[in-house]
């Protein structure tokens, strides 16, 4: 079912979003080369229980580009502008990959608005020098041939063993990614390259944090993320045993099941600290 798309102005330009369902508010933030429709399966399932807002982050989907770099703070402020326009004060943010970087920037800037966050194949650490060089090379590739770069990048985010099973999902994600403008891609690469460490945000968070980790994630190694999870005070860790960097497409049922559990536990009036580790095949 096609959802009604709405727009707000942010710094004089357009931010596109959808808003469906009733109840406590959950905001889904896509990753690099994504858009709000990447969440369609997740949104359809979760909106039966919660109010689900999806956003096209700057430079993606139908939202505008800004300047020469989309820093994570800019992304966070675009989300805050939308939530303020909807008069929403408390919510949970779910951020996939780059969306997780934006989520942590939001948590640093606006912690009082959060009831919890989920880092969906994401990290609190800044790029290593090697990774920064990779992004610089990627910018050159995009300027030379954005289509080839985009299709290959998306395909490589899935676990190799899932490429046949998830052929339709790979094609779906590539189709979305190919709509991203060259400027949007470059600005996002620049913004991710410049982001700082935000481990302190995770360590001192006064709300629960969920991490969803893929055993075969080619971008963020499983063990590094598991080690990172040790700094979280109240946590819900989901390990996807057969998946890569696109768990919501590779294993949607498991992700939806555990997201619902995390949301309900996070939204309890007198919640206790969580220490949950779940494993899904």
Where are these regions (language model features)?
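Short beta-strand/loop motif that positions the catalytic acidic residue
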Residues: 205, 211-213, 217
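Conserved HGGG/HGGXW glycine-rich cap/lid loop of the alpha/beta-hydrolase fold
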Residues: 9, 13-68, 72
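Catalytic histidine neighborhood in serine/cysteine hydrolases
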Residues: 226-245
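Conserved alpha/beta-hydrolase catalytic His-Asp/Glu region
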Residues: 126-133, 144-204
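Conserved acidic catalytic loop of the alpha/beta-hydrolase fold
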Residues: 74-91
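Catalytic histidine-centered segment of alpha/beta-hydrolase-like enzymes
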Residues: 243-252, 256
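Conserved hydrolase catalytic core segment
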Residues: 88-128
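Alpha/beta-hydrolase fold catalytic core
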Residues: 1-26, 47-50, 84, 89, ...
């Amino acid at each position: 079912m096609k959802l009604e798309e709405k727009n707000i102005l942010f710094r004089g330009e357009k931010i596109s979003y959808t808003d469906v369902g009733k109840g406590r508010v959950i905001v889904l933030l896509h990753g690099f080369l994504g858009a709000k429709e990447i969440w369609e399966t997740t949104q359809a399932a979760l909106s039966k229980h919660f109010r689900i807002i999806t956003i096209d982050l700057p430079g993606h989907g139908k939202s505008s580009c800004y300047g020469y770099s989309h820093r994570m703070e800019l992304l966070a402020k675009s989300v805050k502008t939308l939530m303020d326009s909807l008069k929403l004060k408390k919510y949970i943010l779910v951020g996939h990959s780059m969306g997780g970087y934006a989520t942590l920037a939001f948590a640093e800037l606006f912690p009082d608005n959060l009831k919890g966050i989920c880092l969906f194949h994401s990290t609190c650490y800044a790029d290593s020098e090697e990774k920064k060089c990779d992004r610089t090379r990627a910018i050159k590739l995009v300027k030379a041939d954005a289509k080839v770069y985009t299709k290959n990048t998306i395909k490589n985010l899935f676990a190799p063993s899932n490429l046949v099973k998830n052929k339709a999902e790979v094609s779906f994600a590539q189709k979305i990614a190919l709509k991203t403008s060259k400027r949007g891609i470059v600005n996002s690469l620049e913004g991710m390259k410049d982001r700082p460490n935000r481990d302190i945000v995770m360590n001192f968070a006064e709300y629960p944090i969920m991490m969803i980790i893929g055993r075969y994630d080619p971008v963020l190694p499983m063990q590094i993320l598991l080690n990172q999870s040790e700094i979280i005070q109240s946590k819900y860790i989901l390990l996807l045993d057969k998946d890569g960097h696109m768990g919501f497409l590779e294993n949607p049922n498991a992700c939806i099941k555990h997201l619902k559990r995390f949301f309900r536990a996070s939204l309890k009036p007198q919640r206790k600290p969580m220490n949950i580790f779940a494993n899904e095949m």
